[in-house]
Amino acid sequence: MYASCERTWLFSLPGWAGRTPGRDAVAEPRRPPGGGGAGGEGLGRSRGGFTTKVHLSADGRCRPLSLVVTAGQRADCTQFEPVLEKVRVPRTGPRRPRNKPDSVACDKAYSNGPCRSYLRRRGIQHAIPEKTDSQAARLRRGSRGGRPPGFDKERYKKRNTVERANNKLKHARAVATRYDKRDYVYLGTVTAAVLAIWLGT
């Protein structure tokens, strides 16, 4: 997710999966109540095998602002609010950190009612393309289908910053290929890589 705030911080919110080596031949651990990944491990089955997904937001300089670690099969849109709620951008002086971006740019994975309603409720502008099936359903209904959601192409072009932030994170071998057993340990590994990115800018 790419977000822009006081000094243009952009939210691009994607999820990407880190592969866990040597786990495919191991019996899957018991899952916690309610489904999801293995209890306390943040691991789950996805098309890439046994994986962990990192959901993050980034500013206009490709620096991660917030992140959430989940099991690999978790849908990106389910972590939209948790990632946005974790954003804190310090201000100069004794003022509280900024936690509301001026705008966000996300891909079609976030083109749904709950995500758009959340942004509308918080007064955040967005650039989220409409899904093809949603567009077709709206057009089928004619005038009853309502107006298409607003979409700013220029703002959406800046979404690449989060993809570049992901690439920077994946330069850390322990992030791209997960070796940590517990999810909180892996979260610490990713956080250390984020700090390295910030210190290098």
Residue ranges, per PLM feature:
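Active-site beta-loop-alpha junctions of metal-dependent nucleic acid enzymes
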Residues: 68-94
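Helix-centered, glycine/charged polyanion-binding patches within enzymatic domains
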Residues: 73, 91-179
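Generic alpha-helical structural context detector
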Residues: 82-85, 167, 194-197
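Short His-Asn-centered micro-motif
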Residues: 59, 67-70, 106-108
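Structural motif
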Residues: 44, 178-187
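Short conserved beta-strand segments at catalytic cores or DNA/RNA-binding microdomains
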Residues: 52-64, 73, 80-83, 165
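Active-site- or DNA-interface-adjacent structural scaffold in DNA-acting proteins
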Residues: 1-46, 58-61
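Charged phosphate-binding loop/patch that engages nucleotide di/tri-phosphates or the phosphate backbone
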Residues: 189-201
